[in-house]
Amino acid sequence: MGCFQSTARRPRPGYEDPVGLASETAFSVSEVEALFELFKSISGSVIDDGLINKEEFQLALFKNKRKENLFANRIFDLFDVKKRGVIDFGDFVRALNVFHPNIPMEEKIDFSFKLYDMDNTGFIERKEVKQMLIALLGESEMRLSDEIIETILDKTFSDADTNQDGRIDRTEWENFVSRNPSLLKIMTLPYLKDITTTFPSFVFNSEVDDLVT
């Protein structure tokens, strides 16, 4: 009986104490506990192993497992800090923390810079912005001509690439988003102050609209 009980109560892989996670993040203990219920729902959607794989992550984000999405892949890669191809509960909470309204803007800027710096060169290049823009447009079901996309890229780099070397460094990115705060809308999810069992919906239509206009 004792052996059975100890087996039944064994924590899932990657599970961490809510008190410890709350001390490291902007979440309260009760919010971390609510996030665990959310995590269990996502991690069991395809394979019930206590870990979130890329397919489960994309399904939670976009309700679509039929095709890969560059944006979902980038978010997953940044959540997967241990680079194991799966996200455990600790990874999940710490990564979501950057989207909390109480987190300093500096951390949000860092995360968004890494999001676009797909080659991890320390710079955001034109091809990376183009790939991300096309991925965002695809998810929002907006259709823009190649000419309009190139115009958006021209304007972005004209405004952001102040030293005109054809790429955006970390300082240029910080200055650019400071002048265009709407670009960081996706980096704050207000309802993280009131966690429910619904996965935070990363809806980027507003960001695409801002870019287009």
Swiss-Prot record:
Site (Involved in dimerization): S140
GO-annotated molecular function: calcium ion binding; kinase binding
Residues with lipid group (N-myristoyl glycine): G2
Tissue specificity field: Expressed in roots, shoots, culms and scutellum.
Keywords, comma-separated and alphabetical: Calcium, Lipoprotein, Membrane, Metal-binding, Myristate, Repeat, Vacuole
Induction: By salt and drought stresses, abscisic acid (ABA) and gibberellin.
UniProt-annotated binding residues for Ca(2+) 1: D117, D119, T121, E128
Domain of life: Eukaryota
PROSITE patterns per record: EF_HAND_1 (PS00018), EF_HAND_2 (PS50222)
SMART domains: EFh (SM00054)
Keyword Glycoprotein: no
Residues in EF-hand domain copies: 31-66, 67-102, 104-139, 148-183
GO biological-process terms attached to the record: calcium-mediated signaling
Function per UniProt: Acts as a calcium sensor. CBL proteins interact with CIPK serine-threonine protein kinases. Binding of a CBL protein to the regulatory NAF domain of a CIPK protein lead to the activation of the kinase in a calcium-dependent manner.
Protein name: Calcineurin B-like protein 1
Species the sequence originates in: Oryza sativa subsp. japonica
